[in-house]
From Swiss-Prot:
Enzyme Commission number(s): 2.8.1.7
Protein's name in the database: Cysteine desulfurase IscS
Keywords: 2Fe-2S, Cytoplasm, Iron, Iron-sulfur, Metal-binding, Pyridoxal phosphate, Transferase
A Gene Ontology biological process term: [2Fe-2S] cluster assembly
Binding site for pyridoxal 5'-phosphate: G85, T86, N165, Q193, S213, G214, H215, T251
Gene coding for it: iscS
Length: 404
């Protein structure tokens, strides 16, 4: 994959550039781009219009809706297109909260959710709602028993992410869904990281609302969806039009929706084959990185996404590691891309009990369809050298871990 710097020049590295930040965003697949292009040019009609090119756009949206529904085991009229995961999370949580506040004002979520969920819940607390933030174990796993104990008579919503964006831990979604159903509480899951990696059937898992975002599985940025089970009582987030069956106002992003539909279709059809490849690469990465002394794996050892590697190196700063990796043409992150500019320690690793003194030394490598065995070789060649270089420079590194 050809990658350029901000001046548009080729990145100079000993080998090709290696992109391992697919949990932040993914390149758009060629097939997805090809599906989108006609709706940026000749098929540009507004779907609300009654003339032919408007009808063509409307038909394209309906086809994309069917593809998204099929991927989730949902019905077509349960899929609503949005601008992405953040809007979907906001709509699900605020929409349920305000539509059902006559029944109660208590919401349950976890301490490791994406900030789109956490910040929305914090905002609702300012509006008079109460939120319980469930703790997680050292692997980032929510306890179903703790969830049961947190339920109150006035609990109206449980929002637990399907898989964590930083550490890749997959939650016991089926059990959580059963608990929610038993107690007649709405269950929302942020599945932004899970689509294309974990098979999802919303009916079998008792999911009432599910958020997804196209750019996380080789679809376009700026387009997502919210699954809302038929019969769920929810208020709109946006007002000003009758689009999306009067629930989500605003002229539809037809090219984005078409791309989302195609990306969803491809990603879900290829889960088995993709996971086989990704698991081999992931496990090689983990095995190789853990050979570096004083390195720890974050997240569940087995119940994790096939593309996720998150490790902590003692005695180094993750920001310095990323800068040196960037100079070598390796692109990774320390955690959530939506919070990458913050110097605050990861709220996810903090919740998992990672000691404060080493929490800043984390590295997330998230694999994608384009990654190869050679990419893994390159990372395993470069990372140990950089870690050692940084340890040699750090006054915190004990003598036995220096090579000066």
């Amino acid at each position: 994959m050809a990658i350029h710097n901000c001046e548009g020049e080729n990145v100079s590295t000993e080998n090709k550039a290696v992109y391992m930040d697919n949990s932040a965003t993914t390149p758009v697949r060629k097939e997805v781009v090809e599906a989108m292009l006609p709706y940026m040019t000749e098929n540009f009609g507004n779907p609300s219009s009654i003339y032919e090119i408007g009808k063509t756009s409307k038909h394209a949206i309906n086809l994309a809706r069917k593809k998204a529904a099929d991927a989730l085991g949902a019905e077509e009229n349960e899929i609503y297109f949005t601008s992405g995961g953040t809007e979907s999370d906001n709509w699900a949580i605020k929409g349920i909260a305000f539509a059902n506040r006559d029944k109660g004002k208590h919401i349950i979520t976890s301490s490791i959710e994406h900030h789109a969920v956490l910040h929305t819940c914090a905002w609702l607390e300012g509006q008079g709602f109460e939120v319980t933030y469930l703790p997680v174990d050292k692997y980032g796993m929510v306890s179903p028993d703790e969830l049961r104990n947190a339920i109150r008579d006035d609990t109206i919503l449980i929002s637990i992410m399907f898989a964590n964006n930083e550490i890749g831990t997959i939650q016991p979604i089926k059990e959580i869904g059963e608990i929610a159903k038993e107690n007649q509480i709405y269950f929302h899951t942020d599945a932004v990281q899970a689509i294309g990696h974990v098979p999802i059937d919303v009916k079998k898992l008792n999911i009432d609302l599910l958020s997804l975002s196209g750019h996380e599985f080789e679809g376009p940025k700026g387009c997502g969806a919210l699954y809302i089970r038929k019969g769920v009582k929810i208020d709109p987030l946006l007002h000003g039009g009758a689009q999306e069956r009067k629930r989500r106002a605003g002229t539809e992003n037809v090219p984005g929706i078409v791309g989302l539909g195609k990306a969803t279709e491809l990603a879900t059809a290829e889960i088995e084959e993709s996971n086989r490849t990704l698991l081999k690469l992931r496990d090689r990465l983990i095995e190789g990185l853990l050979k570096i002394p004083k390195t720890h794996l974050n997240g569940h050892p087995t119940q994790r996404l096939a593309n996720n590697v998150n490790v902590t190196f003692e005695y180094i700063e993750g920001e310095s590691l990323l800068l040196l990796l960037n100079a070598k043409g390796i692109y990774a992150s320390t955690g959530s891309a939506c919070n990458s500019s913050s110097l605050e320690p990861s709220h996810v690793l903090t919740a998992c009990g990672v000691p404060h003194e080493i929490i800043h030394g984390s590295l997330r490598l998230s694999l994608g369809r384009m990654n190869t065995s050679e990419d893994v070789d390159r990372v395993l060649e470069v990372v140990p050298e950089i870690v050692q270089k940084l340890r040699n420079m750090s006054p915190l590194t004990p003598k036995e871990y220096r090579t000066l």
